[in-house]
């Protein structure tokens, strides 16, 4: 190991290197890439299957991850093929974005499908969409109802639990609305049942904005004196 560039090793360090099958050739391969690492980092890389060849391929793609990022990329399965696929889909993410995208299950196919639906999310957007389960089926269902939300609106809708069924119920009540009003209505708990209850008490033909205001007043709550 001393000949490979690792000198003055403790017994524990030698044992760790031996257990993980860290060879002098492996160390030299890292050194040839300009990586002069401590024993703990070398062991971490070996445990995760980081090879000099992997690092070389990643750099060939124009990425310059640091030691921790290299390990993170390998742990999360960020392969050169994955990077190429994401780039071919129209993204140019940095290392941290690639790791986040892989963690959240962002695939090139998902990105292409979003673009086919007319959406143009950036790297951070697409991660948020995956986190909030904004899948292609959900997007298509919303589009089929005549709405074209932005990326941020889709994320907000999903966070607040706006479903196609909820939209249909509001439409069936004769309401028209934009995405902001729709999300506000969901937050405030304006439902088809509430709309029917309002009509029963004489609050008919209200706009969604007025229904939201009515819900906020609480005058139709069961405890209220109507």
Functional labels for PLM-detected ranges:
Residues 1-226:
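General marker for long, soluble alpha-helical cores
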